[in-house]
Amino acid sequence: MSTPSLDNLIELGAISEAQGLQGQVKVRPHSPDPVALLSSKVVWLSLLPRRSAGALSSTEEATLTQYKVKSAKMHSGNVVLTLDGVSDRDQALALKGARILLDRDAFPKAESDSYYWVDLIGCKAKNLQDEILGDVIDVTENGAHGVIAIGDISTKTIQYLVPFVKEVVRNVDLPNKLLTLDWQSDWV
C-alpha cells in the first residue's frame, strides 16, 4: 500500500505506553469517541513531534511507518492496538510517543447529523444575520461539549470560541464548507 496524500493523513492520537507483554500499545486518542481509530485496518506512525495543525512536511513523510492493525479495543478511556510486526513489550516501548495517523478516506461514514471535527476545519462561519465571523480553525472538547475556534485560518488567530451545541450551531453545510451560527459578531 502506498502512502496516502500527506494532506489526507489525520492525527488521531499518540502512543502513551506499552500494554502487557505481547507488543500491544496503548493509544491516548484525541477524540472521546475514537470510532475511526477503533475501525482502522491500517495506521501510519510518526515519531517526529507534532508541529502546528495542517499538512505534514516532506521530512515527516520520510519518517512515516505503516502498520496493519490486527485488533483494536477500548480500555479505560484509551485504545489498545495490536500492530502487525510488534510482538513484544520492547518493540511496543520503542513506539512510545509516536503519533497515530489515519487516511481520511478510511474513516467510517459519519452518522446523520454527526460530523468528524476535522471536516469542519476550514469551513466559513456566518451568523443568522449573514455576517461572516471567520473560518473554523479548530474544534476541541471541553468535557461538556465541543468548542469551535473561529478566526483567521491563515494566521491561526482566534476571534471567537463558540460552543458546538444545537442551540448555537444551526446548520452545517459540509459540501459548501459553511456553518450557520446563532452568534453575534460583537460577542467576544
UniProtKB/Swiss-Prot annotation:
Subcellular compartments: Cytoplasm
Chief place of localization: cytoplasm
Gene3D superfamilies the UniProt entry points to: PRC-barrel domain (2.30.30.240), RimM (2.40.30.60)
Pfam families per the UniProt record, alphabetical: PRC_RimM, RimM
Alphabetical list of InterPro entries matching this protein: PRC_barrel-like_sf, PRC_RimM, RimM, RimM_N, RimM_N_sf, Transl_B-barrel_sf
Residue ranges of domain PRC barrel in the record: 112-187
GO MF entry, a single one: ribosome binding
UniProt entry keywords in alphabetical sequence: Chaperone, Cytoplasm, Ribosome biogenesis, rRNA processing
SUPFAM superfamilies from the UniProt entry: PRC-barrel domain, Translation proteins
Protein's job: An accessory protein needed during the final step in the assembly of 30S ribosomal subunit, possibly for assembly of the head region. Essential for efficient processing of 16S rRNA. May be needed both before and after RbfA during the maturation of 16S rRNA. It has affinity for free ribosomal 30S subunits but not for 70S ribosomes.
Entry comment, domain topic: The PRC barrel domain binds ribosomal protein uS19.
Similarity-based family: Belongs to the RimM family.
The protein's assembly and partners: Binds ribosomal protein uS19.
Protein name, UniProt field: Ribosome maturation factor RimM
Organism, scientific name: Polynucleobacter asymbioticus (strain DSM 18221 / CIP 109841 / QLW-P1DMWA-1) (Polynucleobacter necessarius subsp. asymbioticus)
